[in-house]
C-alpha cells in the first residue's frame, strides 16, 4: 500500500474592495486556485512554518485578496480555510488541539473547511467537536470530501447539524454585514455526483462577490459553475498528479 504523506494547509484570507484598474479582476473560472487568484491581483503572500508553536501544522499562509465586488462593509473580513485533516491517520489528537488553538489565534470571521475530515467513523465526533470549538463570528461552512461520502455520511450530517456547522451541498449561503452581503457556494464532491443525482449547476449573479468551496479542483471539469470570484479547494494535499485523465 502506498504510504500517505499528509500535511494540513491553513490559509487566512483578508478580503478587501478595490476600485483601481490595477486590481480589477474578472470573475474567475472554477479551476482557478486561490494562489492564482492572489497572483492575479498582485498582492503579497507570506508563508511561515508553524512547527514549534503549533505542532502538527505544516504550513500557514496568509493572503490579502482584493476584488472590486467585495463590499466596503467586508473590508478586512478574515476567512480561515482548512482541508484534508484525515483525522486520525497522520494528523493526531495533539495536532488537532493545536489546530484549534491556531485557528482561534487568527480571530477569523468565518471558517471554511474543504472536506476529508476523518480516517474512520469513530473519529467523526471528535474532529467535528474540535472544529465547533473554533470561535468565528459569522459561522463555519463545510463541504465534504470523498472519504466523508464513502463512510459515515449520515453520522457526519447529524454531527454538523448538532454543532451548527453549515454543510454546503449544492447550496449557497449569504453572509451579511452592515447591509451588505457576500455569498458562499458549496458543491458536492464530483466523485459522488452520478450516484446521488444532485444537479451539478449553480447559477450565481455576476454582481455578487462569490466564494466557491469545493473539495477537489477537478470539479471544474464536470459542472457548470459561473460567476465565482474566489475558489477554495482541498484534496490534492499540496500537489496535483493525474494519470490517463483520471481523478487525482
Q: Which residues fall in each region the model found?
A:
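Acidic, histidine-bearing metal-coordination/catalytic regions of metal-dependent phosphoesterases
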Residues: 2-78
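Extended active-site neighborhood of metal-dependent phosphoesterases/phosphodiesterases
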Residues: 40, 52, 64-66, 129-193, ...
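Membrane-embedded segments
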Residues: 56-58, 70-166
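Active-site-proximal beta-strand elements of phosphoester/diester hydrolases
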Residues: 76-86, 181-190, 211-215
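Catalytic metal-binding/acid-base residues of hydrolase active sites
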Residues: 86, 117-118, 147-148, 172-173, ...
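Conserved beta-sheet core of the metallophosphoesterase superfamily
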Residues: 132, 217-248
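Short, charged, surface-exposed secondary-structure boundary motifs
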Residues: 177-179, 195-196, 240-247
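Short beta-strand/loop segments at the ligand-binding rim of alpha/beta enzyme cores
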Residues: 203-212
Amino acid at each position: 500500500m502506498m504510504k500517505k504523506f499528509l500535511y494540513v494547509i491553513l490559509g487566512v484570507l483578508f478580503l478587501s474592495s478595490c476600485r483601481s484598474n490595477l486590481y480589477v479582476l474578472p470573475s474567475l473560472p472554477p479551476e482557478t486556485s486561490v494562489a492564482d487568484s492572489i497572483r492575479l491581483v498582485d498582492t503579497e503572500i507570506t508563508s511561515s512554518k508553524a512547527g514549534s508553536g503549533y505542532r502538527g501544522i505544516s504550513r500557514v499562509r496568509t493572503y490579502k485578496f482584493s476584488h472590486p465586488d467585495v463590499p466596503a462593509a467586508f473590508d478586512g473580513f478574515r476567512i480561515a480555510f482548512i482541508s484534508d485533516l484525515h483525522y486520525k491517520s497522520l494528523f493526531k489528537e495533539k495536532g488537532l488541539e493545536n489546530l484549534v488553538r491556531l485557528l482561534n489565534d487568527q480571530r477569523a470571521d468565518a471558517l471554511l473547511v474543504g472536506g476529508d475530515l476523518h480516517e474512520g467513523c469513530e473519529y467523526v465526533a471528535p474532529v467535528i467537536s474540535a472544529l465547533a470549538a473554533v470561535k468565528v463570528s459569522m459561522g463555519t461552512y463545510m463541504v465534504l470530501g470523498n472519504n466523508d461520502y464513502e463512510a459515515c455520511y449520515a453520522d457526519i450530517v447529524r454531527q454538523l447539524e448538532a454543532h451548527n456547522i453549515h454543510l454546503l451541498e449544492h447550496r449557497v449561503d449569504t453572509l451579511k454585514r452592515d447591509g451588505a452581503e457576500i455569498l458562499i457556494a458549496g458543491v458536492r464532491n464530483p466523485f459522488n455526483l452520478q450516484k446521488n443525482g444532485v444537479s451539478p449547476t449553480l447559477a450565481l449573479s455576476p454582481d455578487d462577490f462569490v466564494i466557491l468551496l469545493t473539495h477537489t479542483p477537478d470539479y471544474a471539469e464536470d459542472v457548470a459553475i459561473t460567476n465565482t470570484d474566489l475558489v477554495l479547494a482541498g484534496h490534492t494535499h499540496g500537489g496535483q498528479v493525474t494519470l490517463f485523465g483520471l481523478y487525482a
